[in-house]
């Protein structure tokens, strides 16, 4: 990395394992400056509970970024709304979580940070606080005024993007339109090139129906919608294979020659990836005007403050963000 960059981290739900994981991140050196948008006492109390050293450094945006030393974090202070007990949700802190996300997102939009890495949030408690919240992806899409974003999960061996995300299964078929597929595949192809450094990415596209429709005998969405879109995009120079049956696509015969898979819906592609690499996966939001990665797990309230949380996914998310920064420079 030619110049040291700043990345911003949001720990997520304060009563969950997010603060534990951020404190664990601080136990090693990093080639970027780690700016954590959080309450200072939350971090120091959690570090004390875990028996880990932590010094919080003041955030100085007007000074050059420095690599993060082990045992330290740079603090961008955001005040809690109520005291925190690990493992116990507080509706009062639902707004605090959103405050951290908003500040981090705005900093990325203004060029203050090169990437954003998010810890796990509890959607229920945010909504109970009176803040409509579907998830990180939708929040950043709206706040950045992005035209469209795409959710992708990745491990070292596999990348799976989704044409639709958090929809009831009965609504998926109606959502798979030519316009949607053109947009999603365009974003996926663009970001694989610009953020992942792949000059000519090869994308495998799942069918919607069992056996990819079996020639129209198990549904016609492949014939009516997916195939025409893929033909059009291939004519524009994209390397696309499909539509392929999802039950046979996830094998070396196909994956060894591909850079990403596009699944039509959430539970078509993600169970395979999470079985293959749970705890090592990263959630990436494509289509944003900045780099955003996240852990692939939840708040694990029962583990908060106990020293049992696995920091692996957070480390992977941060390392991937650093690689993406390099690819975009």
UniProtKB/Swiss-Prot annotation:
EC code: 1.1.1.262
Keywords: Cobalt, Cytoplasm, Magnesium, Metal-binding, NAD, NADP, Oxidoreductase, Pyridoxine biosynthesis, Zinc
Required cofactor(s): Zn(2+); Mg(2+); Co(2+)
GO molecular function: 4-hydroxythreonine-4-phosphate dehydrogenase activity; cobalt ion binding; magnesium ion binding; NAD binding; zinc ion binding
Catalysis: reaction(s): 4-(phosphooxy)-L-threonine + NAD(+) = 3-amino-2-oxopropyl phosphate + CO2 + NADH
Record-level GO BP terms: pyridoxal phosphate biosynthetic process; pyridoxine biosynthetic process
Class in the EC hierarchy, top level: oxidoreductase
Pfam families: PdxA
Cellular location(s): Cytoplasm
A GO cellular-component term linked to this record: cytoplasm
Residues annotated to bind substrate: 136-137, 274, 283, 292
Positions bound to a divalent metal cation: 166, 211, 266
Cofactor binding remark: Binds 1 divalent metal cation per subunit. Can use ions such as Zn(2+), Mg(2+) or Co(2+).
Function noted in UniProt: Catalyzes the NAD(P)-dependent oxidation of 4-(phosphooxy)-L-threonine (HTP) into 2-amino-3-oxo-4-(phosphooxy)butyric acid which spontaneously decarboxylates to form 3-amino-2-oxopropyl phosphate (AHAP).
Protein family according to the UniProt entry: Belongs to the PdxA family.
Note: The active site is located at the dimer interface.
UniProt name for this protein: 4-hydroxythreonine-4-phosphate dehydrogenase
Organism, as annotated: Citrobacter koseri (strain ATCC BAA-895 / CDC 4225-83 / SGSC4696)
């Amino acid at each position: 990395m030619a110049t040291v960059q700043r990345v911003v981290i949001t720990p997520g739900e304060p009563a969950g394992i997010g603060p534990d994981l951020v404190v664990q991140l601080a136990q090693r050196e990093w080639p970027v400056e780690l700016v954590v948008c959080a309450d200072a006492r939350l971090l120091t109390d959690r570090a004390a509970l875990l028996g880990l050293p932590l010094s919080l450094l003041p955030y100085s945006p007007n000074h050059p970024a420095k690599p993060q030393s082990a045992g330290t974090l740079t603090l961008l202070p955001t005040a809690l709304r109520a005291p925190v007990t690990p493992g116990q949700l507080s509706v009062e802190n639902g707004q605090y979580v959103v405050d951290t996300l908003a500040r981090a997102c705005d900093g990325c939009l203004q060029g203050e940070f090169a990437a954003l890495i998010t810890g796990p949030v509890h959607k229920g408690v945010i909504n109970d606080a009176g803040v409509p919240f579907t998830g990180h992806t939708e929040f950043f899409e709206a706040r950045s005024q992005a035209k469209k974003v795409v959710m992708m999960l990745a491990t070292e061996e596999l990348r799976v993007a989704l044409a639709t995300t958090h929809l009831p299964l009965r609504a998926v078929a109606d959502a798979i339109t030519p316009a949607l597929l053109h947009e999603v595949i365009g974003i996926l192809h663009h970001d694989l090139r610009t953020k992942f450094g792949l000059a000519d990415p090869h994308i495998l596209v799942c069918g919607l129906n069992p056996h990819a429709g079996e020639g129209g005998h198990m549904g016609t969405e492949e014939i009516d919608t997916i195939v025409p879109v893929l033909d059009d995009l291939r004519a524009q120079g994209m390397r696309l294979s499909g539509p392929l049956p999802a039950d046979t696509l996830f094998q070396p015969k196909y994956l060894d020659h591909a850079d990403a898979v596009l699944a039509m819906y959430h539970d078509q592609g993600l169970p395979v990836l999470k079985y293959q690499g749970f705890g090592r996966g990263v959630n990436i939001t494509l289509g944003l005007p900045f780099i955003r990665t996240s852990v692939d797990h939840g708040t694990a309230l029962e583990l908060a403050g106990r020293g049992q949380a696995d920091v692996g996914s957070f480390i992977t998310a941060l390392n991937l963000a650093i690689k993406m920064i390099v690819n975009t420079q």
